[in-house]
């Protein structure tokens, strides 16, 4: 029987730590389910990228890392903000899996409580390989490209991701209000 693992992250953006973790996950199982957390969120400072943009980053980064020889699934997971049932919710949203890979102690606890095998994968340079640090560097105009796969840096440039993050950081209040205003569809 095929052994399938689950790995959940927000990927805001995909960085070298994610890819190192996924290399470990891919080495342990036959197939990988990659859950994209906070799937409903985008265009905020904490979650600047859309789910489809994060999927594209993952596809490109996994190809660049030559991790496409095994089957993987990208599954959007909107937030439910209810920790007690979160693991059950995830189980209902993804294909069957045998083992959970995580570096997050809460995620590990929630899946263990549901009877799943959990492997706490090694963390890779968490001090700088964090999406929060990468977004901070983008806002401050500091070098960030070496912290993400080359293909991800190229994609972020293609979609003007740095400009988006800087706009969100400098115009946080006004941009949040603008983004929450109803979109007017022209009448024909």
Swiss-Prot record:
GO biological process terms held by the UniProt record: NAD biosynthetic process
Pathway as given in its UniProt record: Cofactor biosynthesis; NAD(+) biosynthesis; NAD(+) from nicotinamide D-ribonucleotide: step 1/1
InterPro entries reported in the protein's UniProt record: Cyt_trans-like, NMN_Atrans_arc, Rossmann-like_a/b/a_fold
Enzyme Commission number(s) from the entry: 2.7.7.1
Subcellular localization, as worded in the UniProt entry: Cytoplasm
Pfam families: CTP_transf_like
Any one annotated GO CC term: cytoplasm
Keyword Transit peptide: no
One Gene Ontology molecular-function label: ATP binding
Keywords annotated in UniProt: ATP-binding, Cytoplasm, NAD, Nucleotide-binding, Nucleotidyltransferase, Pyridine nucleotide biosynthesis, Transferase
Keyword Cell inner membrane: no
Enzyme class: transferase
Highest taxon listed in the record's lineage: Archaea
Catalytic reactions of this protein: beta-nicotinamide D-ribonucleotide + ATP + H(+) = diphosphate + NAD(+)
Family assignment from sequence similarity: Belongs to the archaeal NMN adenylyltransferase family.
PANTHER family in UniProt: BIFUNCTIONAL NMN ADENYLYLTRANSFERASE_NUDIX HYDROLASE, PHOSPHOPANTETHEINE ADENYLYLTRANSFERASE
Protein name listed in UniProt: Nicotinamide-nucleotide adenylyltransferase
């Amino acid at each position: 029987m095929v052994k399938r693992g689950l790995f959940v992250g927000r990927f805001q953006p995909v960085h070298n730590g994610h890819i190192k973790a996924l290399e470990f996950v891919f080495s342990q199982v036959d197939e990988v389910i990659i859950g994209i957390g906070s799937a409903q969120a985008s265009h905020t400072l904490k979650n600047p990228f859309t789910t489809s943009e994060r999927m594209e980053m993952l596809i490109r980064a996994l190809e660049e890392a030559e991790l496409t020889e095994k089957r993987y699934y990208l599954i959007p997971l909107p937030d439910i903000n209810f920790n007690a049932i979160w693991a059950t919710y995830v189980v209902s949203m993804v294909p069957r899996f045998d083992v959970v890979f995580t570096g997050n102690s809460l995620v590990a606890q929630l899946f263990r409580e549901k009877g799943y095998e959990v492997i706490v994968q090694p963390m890779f340079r968490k001090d700088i390989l964090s999406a929060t640090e990468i977004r901070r560097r983008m806002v401050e105009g500091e070098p960030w490209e070496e912290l993400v796969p080359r293909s991800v840096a190229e994609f972020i440039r293609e979609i003007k991701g740095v400009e988006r993050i800087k706009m969100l950081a400098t115009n946080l209040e006004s941009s949040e209000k603008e983004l929450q205003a109803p979109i007017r569809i022209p009448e024909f």
